[in-house]
Amino acid sequence: MDNNYALPPSGRTPVWRHITKAAKSGDFILQVCQACETVQYPPRELCKDCLQDKLEWQKLSPQGELISHTNLHASTNAFFRRYLPRKIALIKMDCGPIIFAHIAYSDAKTGDRLTIMSKRDLSGEGVFIALTDLIEANVQLDQLNKLLLQD
């Protein structure tokens, strides 16, 4: 039997390490191009708009609007198969980009305002968690902690 099922996949790009570091304190950070001020997601080495390499990590507003969500009912990864179905979402951030996040509140609807929190998953990598203000954050996080969060 393969014992690798115990943890979520840990492969991320080296650029992602900044998000993992920020997740220790729960900060929401993204790269901002110092040449054209475009906020970047996903993290990258060159600006998606002007191709400059002047990207700086900044703490940004964690607020956004839910634009799409779905329940995952299948996975090719053994770890995630144990925790299906799971809700994931696309959130249009007030600071600009659309990000992918795990969503903690199962009744969230398109158009709902959400707050993004950085957390570490069981492999120690940073992930984004979308929370609603309709329910206490600790209640929402308890559901995800059982599944995939370290802290």
Predicted regions mapped to residue ranges:
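A broadly conserved sequence feature marking short terminus-proximal activation segments
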Residues: 1-28, 122-139
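Conserved hydrophobic positions within beta-strands
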Residues: 64-67, 103
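Short functional micro-motifs and their immediate structural scaffolds
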Residues: 41, 54-56
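Short, cysteine/histidine-rich loop/knuckle motifs that typically chelate Zn2+
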Residues: 32-35, 46-52
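Short, conserved beta-turn/loop elements at beta-strand boundaries and strand-helix junctions
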Residues: 69-74
